[in-house]
């Protein structure tokens, strides 16, 4: 599995991030797991084609007491296995990492 990880976070920082993710309605229903939505404009042609049946698409963000991991696999929330489930390409990967880094900056989380 490919990940983008940030560690050495304080428990207070991860609690603040968890609250922000809940406020944005990114909760998954599982403790410590959040879904970061993939912008529609950045979906692959196959993902656009499958969006009605397999979407929405998201990257999983796993939040632990002192770290976070952004999974770089684009998951189809409507289906577990499909050709549209694939690793983020370079542009999407860079966008999602920058998005997460900006969120951490906005929350004054150094990481």
Please provide the spans of the model-predicted regions.
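Terminal, regulation- and interaction-focused segments at domain boundaries
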Residues: 1-19
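C-terminal basic regulatory modules in eukaryotic proteins
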Residues: 51-111
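Short, surface-exposed beta-strand/loop "edge" segments at domain boundaries and coil↔beta transitions
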Residues: 12-15, 43-44, 77-81
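Charged, low-complexity, helix/coiled-coil-prone segments
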Residues: 1-4, 35-51, 93-102
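A structural detector for beta-sheet-dominated domains
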Residues: 7-9, 37, 73
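Small/flexible residues
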Residues: 4, 21, 79-83
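Ser/Thr-rich, low-complexity intrinsically disordered terminal regions
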Residues: 16, 20-58
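A generic structural signal for beta-strand entry/edge sites
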Residues: 3, 31-33, 67-69
């Amino acid at each position: 599995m490919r990940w983008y990880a940030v560690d050495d976070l304080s428990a207070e920082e991860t609690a603040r991030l968890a609250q922000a993710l809940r406020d944005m309605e990114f909760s998954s229903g599982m403790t410590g797991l959040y879904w970061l939505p993939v912008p529609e404009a950045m979906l692959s042609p196959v993902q656009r084609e499958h969006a009605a049946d397999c979407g929405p698409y998201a990257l999983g963000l796993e939040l632990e007491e002192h770290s976070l991991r952004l999974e770089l696999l684009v998951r189809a929330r409507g289906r577990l296995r499909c050709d549209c489930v694939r690793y983020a390409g370079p542009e999407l990967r860079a966008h999602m990492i920058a998005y997460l880094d900006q969120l951490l900056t906005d929350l004054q989380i150094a990481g």
